[in-house]
Amino acid sequence: MKRMILLSMAMVMSMTMLFAQSREGLTEYKLDNGLTVMLWEDHDQPDVTGYVAVRAGAMDEPAEYTGLAHYLEHMLFKGTQKIGALDWEKEKPFYEEIIRLYDEYAETTDEAKRAELTKKINEASIEAAKYSTVEDFFVLLDGIGATGVNAYTSYDMTCYHNSFPATNMYKWLTIFSDRLIDPVFRTFQAELENVFEEYNMYQDDVMTHVRHNLYSKLYAGHPY
C-alpha cells in the first residue's frame, strides 16, 4: 500500500512539473463565442500540432448509457452535411428516419418490437449509405498533409488532434469547425463494433485493471 501511495505521489509531481514547464511561452486567447485558444509557438518546427479539447467525457454520461462519450468521439469522424455527403438532400430523409427509429427503440422494452425497429434501422442505413461516404474526412485531412489523426476520451475531456503544415492552418480550422458545428452520425450501428473491439482490447491490458482498481478506491461514489 505504501509503495502504491508513493507511486501515485510521483505521478502527480511529474504531471505538475510538466504543466509548469509547458506554461512558458504559452499565450491564451478568449474568443467572442467563448472558445479558449491556447497558442504555443515554436518557429523551429515546420508543422503545427492542433488539439481541439472539449470539457466533457465519461463522467458526464447518463448511468444507463455508459460508453456514450467514447462513442460520440468516434462518430465525429463520420463527416458533416458537407464533408462525406454525396447528396445531402437525398441522404437527409433517411438520416432523420434513423434518428426517429432510434428514439422509438429507446422508449420500448418489448424485444419483438426492438427487433422490428432494428430491421428498419438497417434498411434505412443501407439507403442513406448510397448518398454518402465516411472516408471524406480522412481524405481531406490527408490532402492538407495532416499526420497522426486521432482522438481520445477521458473522464472529463474529449480531445481531437493531429499535425499539419503551418501553411494549411485555415483549411484545418475550416474542417475541424465544420465537424463540431454540423456533424452527421453516419454508420451509427457499424461503429458500435469498433468501440467494443477497443473495449475488449483494453480488458487485456494489465495497467487498465490497475488504474480502474486504484480509481475505484480513490474516487469511491464518484463518476471517476
Predicted regions mapped to residue ranges:
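Sec-dependent signal peptide recognition
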Residues: 2-10, 14
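His/Glu-rich zincin catalytic helix
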Residues: 5-7, 18-134, 159-166, 170-177, ...
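Catalytic zinc-binding patch centered on the HExxH motif and its immediate surroundings
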Residues: 30-32, 39-41, 144-154
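Short, glycine-/polar-rich solvent-exposed loops and beta-turns at beta-strand/coil boundaries
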Residues: 65, 152-155, 191, 206
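Acidic/histidine-enriched alpha-helical segments
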Residues: 89-92, 184-200
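Gly-rich Lys/Arg/Thr-decorated short loops/hinges at beta-loop-alpha junctions or inter-strand turns
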Residues: 219-224
